[in-house]
């Protein structure tokens, strides 16, 4: 029973969601009365719902089938528009525009009434003022005013050949009237200028031509001067940065009283924009739109630059609204040096970081390559005879010191002396018999460029540093008297240096240490292995010339490739 109840509740909840999602909020209804035989559009807009990602569909009630999107049909939906090409008497009815987004649904209704009525037809009763689709407009007496031909169609429709009529006669340009596209300028308005006007235009859609007629009933009225000064909220005599060759649209926003009929237009060099650029049509004035407020009307007249040219820079384009005027000036954009500077700085920092990363990763190989590429066979004139003094722990007889002796007395000379051409002083191998230990060490340590110290983790292995004069004199001369660079090599990983003499602790802290990998194979005796590269990196950048008695032709270095060390001739340059 419980499962059935839960299932029923779930189905009921989903049903509620479905009904809520399918319910649309009615916004308002438009009543439109218009004559048959001409194109008619209606744009479904409900800001901000139609500004984002929405699904908009037109219907004719009571049908649930949407209006077709096929542009070749007489009645079809074109984006947010419903378009009749042309109207017929059968088109009368109620049309619904349904707007859906991710969260809401709205619908706008249009009550369309199509009447049989024709301009200047003998069957027409009365004047055009009685026409159902007439527009009411006002002209100010004693001033200049303008009439607007309302032509709002989707982008798929092209409009041209706009003509103006008073009564049934076409208006020609003269002192009284100045037709300018969708706008008719009336100079020095008088009472007799009121009456019936009309504008017509040719509409082209997918190669088909239609004629549009708008009927305008004009009243003349005297308006108090104090109330008729319009307010231009934008532009504000400002400049606009715009790149050369770009497209620009600028709106002129005007707030005016409802009874005001001031002329609203764009001018350049005291000439209407459409007249000034009538040949190229590169710059055009747009169609005026308006929004009614309580006691005012907000007008918008835009100017479109299809392609900005050099001649447009520095030239004022002025928006006029009666006695009010405001201009814009196009200026060439100033290069944003901050962006270039920031980009250059970021690139430089990235380069520095990359170079430092590469250097830290490959500095040993880079330094060894540099020494090899730019080495000299001449010995440095520093009065030194040895490249390094080797100091290593001496184990008592019977202890496990064989590996240390093998490394120091066999492998070390094999690699550094025979393969790389260095000269080492190893006490117990290079001193002359019978010499006093103190004098031997004191004399030879002065002739060395480096001090190479081997340490082991056993605390006892370096206990001799506290007692034997060799170690004491070597470390003293290296750190105090001669400022020698010390190479510290760990025979095994030393975790705790606290048991070591303070001199060794100081060397470890200042110079770091190189750890021997404990490999005594043939491959480990190659100067190109990782361990010996580190040792060579800390050794002096030199080798003895071939004529030196230290270097023998019989010395054969190794060549390490694919994990093997093969014999080769010549010396490896450190």
UniProtKB/Swiss-Prot annotation:
Q: Tell me where on the tree of life, at the top rank, the source sits.
A: Eukaryota
Q: Could you name the active-site residues?
A: 470
Molecular-function GO term, any one: cytokine receptor activity
Its record classes its membrane topology as: Single-pass type I membrane protein
EC number of the protein: 3.2.2.6
Q: Which region is the signal sequence?
A: 1-21
Q: Which locations, inside or outside the cell, does it occupy?
A: Membrane
Show the catalytic activity.
Answer: NAD(+) + H2O = ADP-D-ribose + nicotinamide + H(+)
Knockout consequences: Complete protection from imiquimodum (IMQ)-induced skin pathology observed in wild-type mice, including hyperkeratosis, acanthosis, neutrophil recruitment, and expansion of IL-17-producing T-cells.
Q: Which UniProt keywords apply?
A: Disulfide bond, Glycoprotein, Hydrolase, Immunity, Immunoglobulin domain, Inflammatory response, Innate immunity, Membrane, NAD, Receptor, Repeat, Signal, Transmembrane, Transmembrane helix
| Ranges of the Cytoplasmic topological domain | 360-574
Name a Pfam family for this protein: TIR
Please list the residues annotated as glycosylated.
43, 55, 111, 231, 237, 253, 269, 290, 302
Which coarse location class applies to the principal site listed for this UniProt protein?
membrane
- According to the UniProt topology, which residue ranges lie Extracellular? 22-338
Expression across tissues is: Expressed in bone marrow-derived dendritic cells, splenic CD4(+) T-cells, bone marrow-derived macrophages and bone marrow-derived neutrophils.
Q: Which residues form the TIR domain?
A: 384-539
| Main function | Receptor for interleukin-36 (IL36A, IL36B and IL36G). After binding to interleukin-36 associates with the coreceptor IL1RAP to form the interleukin-36 receptor complex which mediates interleukin-36-dependent activation of NF-kappa-B, MAPK and other pathways. The IL-36 signaling system is thought to be present in epithelial barriers and to take part in local inflammatory response; it is similar to the IL-1 system. Seems to be involved in skin inflammatory response by induction of the IL-23/IL-17/IL-22 pathway.
Query: What does the sequence similarity comment in the record state about its family?
Result: Belongs to the interleukin-1 receptor family.
Query: According to its record, what is known about the domains?
Result: The TIR domain mediates NAD(+) hydrolase (NADase) activity. Self-association of TIR domains is required for NADase activity.
Quaternary structure annotation from Swiss-Prot or TrEMBL: Interacts with IL1RAP; the association is enhanced by IL36B indicative for an functional signaling complex and inhibited by IL36RN.
Q: What is the protein's given name? A: Interleukin-1 receptor-like 2
Source species of the chain: Mus musculus
In the UniProt record, what gene is named as encoding this protein? Answer: Il1rl2
